[in-house]
Amino acid sequence: MTMPGARGWPKWFALAALVIVLDQISKLYFNSRFQYGEIRPVVEGFFNFTLVYNPGAAFSFLHDAGGWQKYLFTILAFAVSGWLGWNIVKRRFSGLMNLAAAFIMGGALGNVIDRLAYGHVIDFIMVHYYNEWYYPAFNLADSFICVGAALMVADSMKKPSR
């Protein structure tokens, strides 16, 4: 089914490219200005910048698997991005779903660049509650993937038009 409000697929690909550029610039910045493991508080007790490398996936899943996971996550990112891109081009998504897809594609491909270039993903954002609770470090690509996923959920909860 073709969605009437989903025209202009190049803008969604441009948005995905912008996400990749922002992600890569931020990673280059932190990788060049921080020592590995260095922590700089931004909001004391809640938010830090740091520099860590993640050879696995979210929450360091499979970080110690021996290297094959890099290829698995790369193939998965290309497959998902290809499927999302195809659906954007074929106008099968609503406008909100296109936005979500662009965010997910940009984030996934931003992390693929890291995996292929460095063998790991560069993370630098650390959210925590003093010394009691720490969320795993993440990056802009991860943030865009999460926002995209939330937008997909929101889009799926909309009532269908008659």
UniProtKB/Swiss-Prot annotation:
Family named by the database record: Belongs to the peptidase A8 family.
Name assigned to this protein: Lipoprotein signal peptidase
GO biological-process terms attached to the record: proteolysis
Transmembrane parts of this sequence: 12-32, 42-62, 66-86, 93-113, 133-153
Membrane topology (UniProt): Multi-pass membrane protein
Active-site feature positions: 123, 142
GO molecular function, one term: aspartic-type endopeptidase activity
Pathway(s) the chain acts in: Protein modification; lipoprotein biosynthesis (signal peptide cleavage)
HAMAP family documented for this protein: LspA
Entry's localization field: Cell inner membrane
Functional description taken from the UniProt entry: This protein specifically catalyzes the removal of signal peptides from prolipoproteins.
